Amino acid sequence: MYKLCRCSKPVKRLWISSVEKNDIIDGFNNLKNDSDYDRLFQSGYARSKADWLVGMNGTRLFSAMYNNFLSVGRVQTPTLKIIVDRENEINNFKSEKYYTVLLNCGEFTAESARIPDLPTAKKILQNVNAGTAFIKSIKKESKKVSPPKLFNIADLQKTANRLFGYTAKQTLDYAQSLYEKKLITYPRTDSNYVNSSMKDKIIQLTAAASGIMSAEISFTPDADRVINDKKVTDHHALLPTLSVSDADIEAIPDSEMKILRLICSQLIYAVSPEHIYESTAITVSCADTDFTALGKKISQMGWKEFQLKFVSLLTGKEMSVKETIFTDNIVEGLVIENHSEKIADHQTTPPKRYTDSSLISAMERAGNEDYEDENVEKKGIGTQATQAGIIETIIKRGYVERSGKNLCPTQKGISLIEAVPEEIKSPKTTAIWESKLQLIEKGEYSPDDFMNEINEFVKNLVDTYSKEDNINKDLSFRAERKVIGLSLIHISEPTRPRLIS
């Protein structure tokens, strides 16, 4: 609006991550110069123009080619390809049997490495049965598991999908409602950290969160663990607000309450002590074959103590940490006097279909190996604020359908991926663009140069694939409308997109 009105008046920006009264007042007392966000604006504006140009022209092009409305997008099509590729992996998967030999040593059972065929397994079993078993080595190692980071929106969506079956959009909607109720901070964040200025507030918020979770905090919260000024993006990580202490819990819908408790529990985990345990690996040798047994002895439960309690509270399922502790009489060189053995057969399993949780993870990783600049952060495809919408879009378009938690491609979705060229559906293209958009945000790349590249990409796409000989005649789509004609949408003025009716 500022540009359209040709306004040149100075502008201050209210930049807050919470709509609590004190945060709003503090925000107005510390208004930001709008010019501080010029590069962020340029990057976001270039992103939206690129998405519009690629989506509008790609959609018109392939809809006309196949006489069917085929929605194509810079992010949605690579996302669909991820799902289709997984379906192809499942359909082409051939299960294979393999075997291991289990050696029962009385106090524990050790297992051999994978054996590819049954005759070999039987031969090993025969040799072991006649052999002498002894403990070849014992290796002990103290290990620490750091607490998880604070939630960003993608992490919250993945956890809610895994625990409650919520779709990414449902989680975002519930979080938005909690934000408007002043119970959590701005939800559409991609950061896992907070600024150093929030150190004291983190201590206060942990106390408030413990009240929501009915948890007794007997340690001093380690606020430094969640502070990283360099990694805080436009908004800090998702947090509860101090208002949760006075909230009418009974008035909050159950679905929203689960999300609020997830956010509160994540804060408590993040500032809790480490989980420490001792791992033990015992190697037993018999008839020139090694067998391995693994043990775990917990030294300090740390944050996992809260995780067990909170996940049980949220899901109604009892959670526990399994320990395998070996007695002190298990020492190197010990001969196992009485041992028994048997063959265990196993089957390789196909990869699982994507859920909202695993698809968001795949989107975060997609194309990361193709980033051209090592100095930019690898963020995959789509932004964390838009990934839920992308999933819902490809479902709405009829390319994907839900089967329980699973996301399954339809025949139309599979055919679309077969129809469009690699440069449209490959995450590599998006990764290259994402790296340049980040450089624009840093002031290290020209928005005009980026848009010139997009314009050229779209022009080449239409020029190349509008020819009839590029139509895959093996594909058939159900005709939905009569196509009158096809023309390239004018791209010399990409800053003023127009509605195409």
Q: Across the structure, where does each feature detected by a protein language model lie?
A:
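Ca2+-coordinating acidic residues in Ca2+-binding motifs
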Residues: 23, 155, 358
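Conserved short loop/turn motifs at secondary-structure junctions
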Residues: 67-71, 140-149, 158-164, 187-196, ...
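Secretory-pathway/luminal and periplasmic proteins that interact with or process carbohydrate-rich
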Residues: 181-187
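Positively charged, polyanion-binding regions of nucleic-acid-associated proteins
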Residues: 131-146, 340-349
